[in-house]
């Protein structure tokens, strides 16, 4: 079940998700990010406009700094040989940042976010890891909206670093540095727009599938459009200043940037975006893909809720068969999220 938040209402978009744990608790977590419900967008716009004006106002003589801009201007003015125009130029730059935030924030009114997390396993530890990703996500989202008025690539890099194992913590636990065993969590976060554009970042999660209403099949999506990083915390960028403080399976050449944000567009009414965790489909079995495609075809004209539930019902029946043949160990938590263009 979603952690928090009502289903966002976007013109021309129908969405619904659900999750079934394999045990009492599970490592799957999904959440609707309803920006209008969670954040006071009008209040944030008003604050940004207020700060844009305040940052231009000189600090009265003898008064303490009112904000970080005042603080930095004081530092500039105390430096030897500083250019007299530098403090004013700095104030103008910081003011313009707030004006841009005020311009970007209104777009959140017509944006719906979706967060999917899959922590390896389906017990208490897995649930705790998924919860850590969730809590980190929302803490950093507050920072993003304060600083930029939208999500940026650096947001995802910070979440990735939070899930990495630090050298200090590993040593404190007495773990062998050569022991590669660790808890794994994948994450997919995307934002949907009314025109059918879905922009997302993927850390180790099975790639989305797109079902064409016209052709009744899953469409092939070029791999070049489906950027995917390893699961959270496994790969630290080599240009990150703290890279030596974390264990990393490999070093990435650079930090996440805008070119790593993948895009999928639902072109026609009835087209469906299918997000899922590997308890439903691991993204590799062609026969399983065909079965899911059949379920999708049989329910494609139904609302997103019914499509989601039909896919989960299929996955549960498949699990019942696995139990009958003694393969309980491959049963995992199941999450399905459907986004349909009306």
Where are the predicted features?
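Conserved subregion of the PPM/PP2C metallophosphatase catalytic domain
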Residues: 1-11, 21-125, 134-342
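Conserved N-terminal boundary motif of the eukaryotic protein kinase catalytic domain
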Residues: 14-15
């Amino acid at each position: 079940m979603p952690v928090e938040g009502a289903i966002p209402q976007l013109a021309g978009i129908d969405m619904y998700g659900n999750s079934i744990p394999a045990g009492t608790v599970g490592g799957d977590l999904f959440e609707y990010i309803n920006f209008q419900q969670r954040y006071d967008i009008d209040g944030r716009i008003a604050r940004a406009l207020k700060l844009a004006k305040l940052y231009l106002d000189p600090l009265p003589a003898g008064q303490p700094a009112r904000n970080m801009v005042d603080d930095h201007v004081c530092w500039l003015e105390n430096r030897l040989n500083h250019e007299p125009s530098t403090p004013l130029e700095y104030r103008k730059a910081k003011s313009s940042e707030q004006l841009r935030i005020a311009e970007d924030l209104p777009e959140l009114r017509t944006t719906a976010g979706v967060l999917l997390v899959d922590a390896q396993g389906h017990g208490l530890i897995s649930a705790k890891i998924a919860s850590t990703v969730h809590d980190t996500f929302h803490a950093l989202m507050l920072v993003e909206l304060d600083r930029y008025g939208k999500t940026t690539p650096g947001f995802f890099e910070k979440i990735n670093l939070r899930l990495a194992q630090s050298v200090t913590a590993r040593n404190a636990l007495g773990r062998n540095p050569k022991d590669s065993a660790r808890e794994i969590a994948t994450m997919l976060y995307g934002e949907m727009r009314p025109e059918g554009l879905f922009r997302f970042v993927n850390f180790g999660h099975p790639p989305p599938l797109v079902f064409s209403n016209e052709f009744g099949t899953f469409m092939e999506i070029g791999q070049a459009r489906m950027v995917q990083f390893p699961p959270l915390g496994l790969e630290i960028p080599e240009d990150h200043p703290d890279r030596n403080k974390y264990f990393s399976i490999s070093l990435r050449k650079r930090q996440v940037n805008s070119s790593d944000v993948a895009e999928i567009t639902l072109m026609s009414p009835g087209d469906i975006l299918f997000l899922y965790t590997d308890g439903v489909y691991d993204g590799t079995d062609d026969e399983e893909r065909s079965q899911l495609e059949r379920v999708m075809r049989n329910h494609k004209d139904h609302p997103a809720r019914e499509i989601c539930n039909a896919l989960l019902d299929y996955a549960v029946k498949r699990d019942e068969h696995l139990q009958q043949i003694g393969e309980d160990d491959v049963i995992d938590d199941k999450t399905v999220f459907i986004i349909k263009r009306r």
